[in-house]
Swiss-Prot record:
Protein's UniProt name: Inhibitor of nuclear factor kappa-B kinase subunit alpha
Activity regulation, short description: Activated when phosphorylated and inactivated when dephosphorylated.
Superkingdom field: Eukaryota
GO cellular component, one term: cytoplasmic side of plasma membrane
Biological classification of the source: Eukaryota, Metazoa, Chordata, Craniata, Vertebrata
EC number assigned by the record: 2.7.11.10
Involvement in disorder: Cocoon syndrome: A lethal syndrome characterized by multiple fetal malformations including defective face and seemingly absent limbs, which are bound to the trunk and encased under the skin. Bartsocas-Papas syndrome 2: An autosomal recessive, severe form of popliteal pterygium syndrome. Popliteal pterygia syndromes have considerable variability in severity and in the associated phenotypic features but they are all characterized by cutaneous webbing across one or more major joints, cleft lip and/or palate, syndactyly, and genital malformations.
Xref: Pfam families: IKBKB_SDD (PF18397), IKKbetaNEMObind (PF12179), Pkinase (PF00069)
GO molecular-function term, one example from the UniProt record: protein-containing complex binding
Top EC class for this record: transferase
């Protein structure tokens, strides 16, 4: 790489010149990189011997650059010591390096032949508008705004535009007017071109011209003519005129509207036209509009801020493949927005499903502003996708976007010969059309992808519920097994002791009813049929994910777009003087692209219908899973209640048994101590058939007393007392020796 004059090989120390970034009227701008630290800076050096006046201008630029500090004005930095030398008696200017190139490079890309995308236009409007406002607030007029003097820098994935080259900038403090200028004529304000006194409004003209070119792909006024020619034809235009073109007849047609095609959303077009009418006013006194007394700034900046602050939601209707846009007033609810969508599309609010690009359904509890991301502008940057929940079959494809008049003209007769200069515009619109078809497919594919992500979210929810259901079913099964075994054991032990212990028909009946309920609840826990349906859906979703139609199928369309771009580039390089050509090859590409789009859209909508059908199956299945889960939980709670109730009854049974044992022990002790004819009458019957229930604990009963009987049995009393004592002792030992350990299991 050629080294700038004055720099000897090796003189830069660790700094190495990597490439020349640009060449201006007096200087070169080169990229320098530090060999060790990976630092990069742009160095502007003088390439010519300068006159005293131009040397002053050069030094003035350095002075201006060093005092500025704004995100949208390129920053000056210190020249590295190893490079800090004078070249042609003027110092070097070191600046931050912006790796994205300049705006001209972006505009020259064939895919931008009909203008930039809306997001790029609005980003440029915001950045450069902010930079110009900053310069003017610091009493600096740039005077040479043009695409070559706007550079792009990627900052955290976002493109930032910066103003460079203040070589022709005018510090207003040095004098309010200036009548000398040597700048770029195509973007020059009329008063500068005519060498008349000027003010800061010259930057408005240049800025408006740039923005118009970014929108349309060409400058606003007879762009194919030299300024000397078009100035005379345009100078008497209406103040609201923002566009002029020459008809085939040679007549100039004026318009207050933006030409088509362009990428601006319909809601942005009108305010943008109003803004351009202020910026492209021929009269410098009226240009930019009056100063707003409240905001203390020209009307053009007020309107610019209004455009940039518009909250616009862009919605792709997947049932019609059409984009609809809505301006969101402050605090509008989502329901209000859905009502507007219903009026526009005919899809009632209850059937609308609005998905973000990540497949998340919009939250009806949040305002409609959730459809708009902060700092993200343009329909090409963010989209919300509208689905009709009442439909699972989306027929598609739909009619392709309409052809412009120019493109339709060559499609009707591809062999017609047109002048090269006219053909360039026609083919530019053809490239825009082909690119548009590809972008239409890409947007619909993003909508399909949102539907797939939504399906996967539903599937994840179904999987979570399935796991919860299986877990609940397994827990119920385990509890039922425990309940069944424990109640069987309880019934067995109860039967063993009831012949000589405690019994209750009412309790026994309740326990048997519990056992029957437990058998019924076992059926509630059977969920195999639901598991089968869920697994079938999982398999279906896996197949949809593997399907080639779930991946982008636009390779052929991209190839056709590139062929159209290559044809257009070849045409641009052909000389335009008195040359003609037909459009046979370009029309072939257009036809093939339409056919390709038709094919991939059929596949896309077929796949989309399967996605939506599968999602509907999940929606239908979820309530069944919820009911099954609810039934299992209810059964689980009932089983636990029955278990608890039975345990309480057992403890009550134990309490009664202990009470009975204590009572009998007390009676036995009394009989052992002293038996008299009077006390013998209180001895209980010894019948083994006597029934003991929970409600009636056996106590000493009154027996028939007879003096005669006492006399007859007095001799046998000692023997009887012994028998009663032994029976009482045996009964107590039997109750205490029962196995009650199951209660603590």
């Amino acid at each position: 790489m050629e080294r700038p004059p004055g720099l000897r090989p090796g003189a830069g120390g660790p700094w190495e010149m990597r490439e020349r970034l640009g060449t201006g009227g007096f200087g070169n701008v080169c990229l320098y990189q530090h060999r060790e630290l990976d630092l990069k800076i742009a160095i502007k050096s003088c390439r010519l011997e300068l006159s005293t006046k131009n040397r002053e201008r050069w030094c003035h630029e350095i002075q201006i650059m060093k005092k500025l500090n704004h995100a949208n004005v390129v920053k000056a930095c210190d020249v590295p010591e190893e490079l800090n030398i004078l070249i042609h008696d003027v110092p070097l200017l070191a600046m931050e390096y912006c790796s994205g190139g300049d705006l001209r490079k972006l505009l020259n890309k064939p895919e931008n032949c009909c203008g930039l995308k809306e997001s790029q236009i609005l980003s440029l409007l915001s950045d450069i508008g902010s930079g110009i406002r900053y310069l003017h607030e610091n009493k600096i007029i740039h005077r040479d705004l043009k695409p070559e003097n706007i550079v792009l820098q990627d900052v955290g994935g976002k493109i930032i535009h910066k103003i460079i080259d203040l070589g022709y900038a005018k510090d207003v403090d040095q004098g309010s007017l200036c009548t000398s200028f040597v700048g770029t004529l195509q973007y020059l304000a009329p008063e500068l071109f005519e060498n008349k006194p000027y003010t800061a409004t010259v930057d408005y003209w240049s800025f408006g011209t740039m923005v118009f070119e970014c929108i349309a792909g060409y400058r606003p006024f007879l762009h194919h003519l030299q300024p000397f020619t078009w100035h005379e034809k345009i100078k008497k235009k209406d103040p609201k005129c923002i566009f002029a073109c020459e008809e085939m007849s040679g007549e100039v047609r004026f318009s207050s509207h933006l030409p088509q095609p362009n990428s601006l959303c319909s809601l942005v077009v009108e305010p943008m036209e109003n803004w351009l009418q202020l910026m492209l006013n021929w009269d410098p006194q009226q240009r930019g509009g009056p100063v707003d007394l409240t905001l203390k700034q020209p009307r053009c900046f007020v309107l610019m801020d209004h455009i940039l602050n518009l909250k616009i939601v862009h919605i792709l209707n997947m049932t019609s493949a059409k984009i609809i846009s809505f301006l969101l007033p402050p605090d509008e609810s989502l329901h209000s927005l859905q009502s507007r969508i219903e009026r526009e599309t005919g899809i009632n609010t209850g059937s609308q499903e609005l998905l973000s690009e990540t497949g998340i359904s919009l939250d009806p509890r949040k305002p409609a502003s959730q459809c708009v991301l902060d700092g993200v502008r343009g329909c090409d940057s963010y989209m919300v996708y509208l689905f009709d929940k009442s439909k699972t079959v989306y027929e598609g494809p739909f009619a392709s976007r309409s052809l412009s008049d120019c493109v339709n003209y060559i499609v009707q007769d591809s062999k017609i010969q047109l002048p090269i200069i006219q053909l360039r515009k026609v083919w530019a619109e053809a490239v825009h059309y082909v690119s548009g078809l590809k972008e239409d497919y890409s947007r619909l594919f993003q909508g399909q992808r949102a539907a797939m992500l939504s399906l996967l979210r539903y599937n994840a929810n179904l999987t979570k519920m399935k796991n919860t259901l299986i877990s609940a079913s397994q827990q119920l099964k385990a509890k039922l097994e425990f309940f069944h075994k424990s109640i069987q054991l309880d019934l067995e032990r109860y039967s063993e002791q009831m012949t000589y212990g405690i019994s209750s028909e009412k309790m026994l009946k309740a326990w048997k009813e519990m056992e029957e309920k437990a058998i019924h609840y076992a059926e509630v826990g059977v969920i195999g049929y639901l598991e089968d349906q869920i697994m079938s859906l999982h398999a279906e979703i896996m197949e949809l994910q593997k399907s080639p139609y779930g991946r982008r199928q636009g390779d052929l369309m991209e190839s056709l777009e590139q062929r159209a771009i290559d044809l257009y580039k070849q045409l641009k390089h052909r000389p335009s003087d008195h040359s003609y050509s037909d459009s046979t090859e370009m029309v072939k590409i257009i036809v093939h692209t339409v056919q390709s789009q038709d094919r991939v859209l059929k596949e896309l909508f077929g796949h989309l219908s399967k996605l939506l059908g599968c999602k509907q199956k999940i929606i239908d299945l979820l309530p069944k899973v919820e009911v099954a889960l609810s039934n299992i939980k209810e059964a689980d709670n009932t089983v636990m209640f029955m278990q608890g109730k039975r345990q309480k009854e057992i403890w009550h049974l134990l309490k009664i048994a202990c009470t009975q044992s204590s009572a009998r022990s007390l009676v036995g002790s009394s009989l052992e101590g002293a038996v008299t004819p009077q006390t013998s009458a209180w001895l209980p019957p010894t019948s083994a058939e006597h029934d003991h229930s929970l409600s009636c604990v056996v106590t000493p009963q009154d027996g028939e007393t007879s003096a005669q009987m006492i006399e007859e049995n007095l001799n046998c009393l000692g023997h009887l007392s012994t028998i009663i004592h032994e029976a009482n002792e045996e009964q107590g030992n039997s109750m205490m020796n029962l196995d009650w350990s199951w209660l603590t299991e």
